[in-house]
Amino acid sequence: GIFGKILGAGKKVLCGLSGLC
């Protein structure tokens, strides 16, 4: 749902900024 999309996008942003992924 909508919340899943928001959480998914947030995880991608955090991964990109932190370089953990």
UniProtKB/Swiss-Prot annotation:
Disulfide bonds join C15-C21. The keyword Disulfide bond applies. Expressed by the skin glands. It comes from the Eukaryota. It is found in: Secreted. This is Nigrocin-2JDa. The keyword Secreted applies. Has antibacterial activity against E.coli ATCC 25992 (MIC=16 uM), E.coli CIB 84492 (MIC=16 uM), S.aureus ATCC 25923 (MIC=16 uM) and S.aureus CIB 85462 (MIC=8 uM). Has antifungal activity against C.albicans (MIC=63 uM). Has hemolytic activity against rabbit erythrocytes. GO terms for cellular component: extracellular region. GO terms for biological process: defense response to fungus; defense response to Gram-negative bacterium; defense response to Gram-positive bacterium; hemolysis in another organism. Belongs to the frog skin active peptide (FSAP) family. Brevinin subfamily. Keywords: Amphibian defense peptide, Antibiotic, Antimicrobial, Cytolysis, Disulfide bond, Fungicide, Hemolysis, Secreted.
